[in-house]
Amino acid sequence: TLSLHDALPILSSEYNRLANMVKRTGNRPTVVANAPFGGVWYVAGGRSYMAQAIADAGGDYVFSDDRSFGGVPKDFESVYFRAGSADFWLNPGPSRSLSSLLELDERFNRFKAFGKGGVFNNTLRVNAYGGNDIWERGTLHPEEVLADLIAIMHPKLLPKHEFVYYERLD
């Protein structure tokens, strides 16, 4: 087995290979992330790891101009104004289906991504107790997370990709 010291250059190399592959495509679909909780939508700041992952996957994050590193509180209307026409919606809370997402707020069906099959959540590997493997294995394998995001936004670049963390909500 490899030590972490020996594995990091390999993982970094694969992440960079994937990110560089996306740079050759001119298409940068728009992306929004997260969902409201308790009436507040905490969007990922434009300098957050999520914003960077979306950019590395060839997406155009709708809040990329924000200078924050963490979550930024917004109301539904301000998010909808910027993200209502986004091509993809990632990580909409704990929902694993579009119907469960609508139970949270029926206005979600106004989002373009909702009506076009563009809602994906990182809930593919959640155990019976709610533990999500993206916060375990995914932190050690950012290249797997990036590959999932590329397969969502640019499926022709990774046509045989099998999702590790993300699933399309139906």
Where are these regions (language model features)?
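Structured C-terminal subdomain patch of bacterial secreted/periplasmic proteins
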Residues: N91-D170
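A hydrophobic alpha-helix/topogenic segment detector
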Residues: S3, V22, D133-W135
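Acidic/histidine-enriched alpha-helical segments
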Residues: P9-E14, V31, V164-E167
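A structural signal for well-ordered alpha-helical segments within the folded catalytic domains
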Residues: L2, S48-A51, L140-A147
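Flexible, glycine-rich surface segments
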Residues: S13-E103
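Short, small-residue-biased leader/transition segments that mark boundaries at the very start
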Residues: T1-L8
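Soluble or luminal CAZymes and related metallo-dependent hydrolases
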Residues: I10, G71, H141, V145
